[in-house]
Amino acid sequence: MASLRPPTLDEVGLEAALRDHVGAFARRSGVACSVRVDLAGRLDGELETVVYRVTQEALLNVARHADAGRLWLELDGTGDRVDLEIRDDGVGFEPATSSALVRDGHFGLVAMQERVEMAGGRFQLDTQPGAGVTLRAMFQVAVPS
């Protein structure tokens, strides 16, 4: 499982890794990006990996499908919650069930949902044609005593 964890998370931490990845995405794609991270401390290693991998896949989807001009990434970790939200102002799409997404070849969205749910989180996707996409991954975490 360690081989699935990007080394950059151990080298620089989640916040810096996200900022680096989003910055590189912005330079490559021309999409203007905003990143806001508010974490009280380091997250569990597995959760850091999930957040990073979901972000990677979400940005890949934006580059391939969204025709977006702006992207916002917000990561909040306060108390017993960690919430990731990634929004774009792209073309959006008609909401569909997981089975319809797979049938239509949208494996990335399904993979993100499965990754989040396997980590005990909740995945939410809000979109409409012409209204961009908002992706949320929400996790309950143990608070150190």
Annotate each PLM feature.
Residues 1-145:
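Coiled-coil dimerization/phosphotransfer module
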